[in-house]
């Protein structure tokens, strides 16, 4: 009597080959996930390469990079604040309008001052005082948004949409549709405008330094402090 050997699938008879194939599939999946996570950065690199080829060395010139860094720093600072909101599952549509409002108020304070009609005097303020005042105004608007969402139960989208239009309306009323340009201030008050904030330090825009400091502070808050743990939770 001849016994026929059991027929096994080829993969069962070659476990080493099966493991190799599984490892390759796993590596391919990990590579694909990595590419998907970094797709924004990849697109950015491709755009830089494309415009470098099209425009030559002028695209990566010092003046161009400085201009880009100045604008990116502004949006980066806004993004840091939005990060905390988005992590908690919220959204804030009013952030751009709030920036426009406080910018308009700051321009008015530094160029025109605040006129007290009942006393017949006009008060002018130094740049540090104006900056602190605008930060307080921004915090108050943010607190109002938070109270509307948490205490009144209004959806963040609706609450911040309303705040966006209110801030935009106040900015238009304050400026009558005009802009504040050539903001020089008054030397006697040490108030020469926002030249320092708009200037460069060691060839790098001041806003980039501010953004870097705020980014480090944000990371420390999220990773090291109980408030950050609560936000991430």
Regions found by a protein language model. Name each.
Residues 38-45, 68, 75-76, 97-101, ...:
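Hydrophobic alpha-helical transmembrane segments
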Residues 48-52, 61-112, 140, 147-154:
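Single transmembrane alpha-helix segments in multi-pass membrane proteins
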Residues 114-163:
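Alpha-helical transmembrane segments within multi-pass membrane transporters and channels
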Residues 17-79, 114-129:
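Membrane-interfacial amphipathic/re-entrant helices at transmembrane-helix boundaries
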Residues 156-225:
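Transmembrane helix-bundle core of multi-pass membrane transporters
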């Amino acid at each position: 009597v001849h016994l026929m050997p059991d027929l096994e699938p080829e993969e069962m008879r070659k476990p080493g080959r099966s493991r190799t194939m599984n490892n390759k599939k796993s590596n391919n999946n990990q590579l694909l996930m990595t590419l998907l996570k970094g797709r924004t950065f990849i697109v950015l690199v491709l755009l830089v390469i494309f415009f470098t080829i099209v425009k030559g060395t002028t695209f990566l010139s010092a003046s161009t990079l400085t201009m880009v860094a100045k604008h990116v720093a502004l949006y980066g600072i806004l993004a840091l604040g939005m990060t905390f909101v988005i992590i908690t599952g919220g959204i804030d549509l009013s952030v751009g309008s709030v920036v426009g409002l406080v910018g308009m108020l700051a321009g008015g304070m530094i160029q025109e001052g605040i006129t007290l009609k009942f006393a017949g005097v006009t008060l002018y303020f130094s740049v540090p005082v104006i900056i602190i005042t605008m930060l307080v105004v921004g915090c108050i608007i943010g607190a109002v948004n938070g109270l509307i969402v948490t205490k009144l139960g209004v959806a963040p989208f609706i609450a911040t949409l309303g705040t966006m239009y209110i801030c935009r309306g106040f900015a238009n009323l304050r400026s009558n549709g005009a802009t504040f340009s050539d903001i020089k201030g008054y030397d006697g008050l040490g108030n020469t405008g926002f030249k320092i904030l708009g200037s460069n330090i060691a060839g790098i825009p001041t806003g980039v330094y501010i953004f870097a400091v705020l980014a480090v502070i944000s990371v420390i808050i999220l990773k090291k402090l109980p408030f950050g743990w609560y936000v991430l939770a």
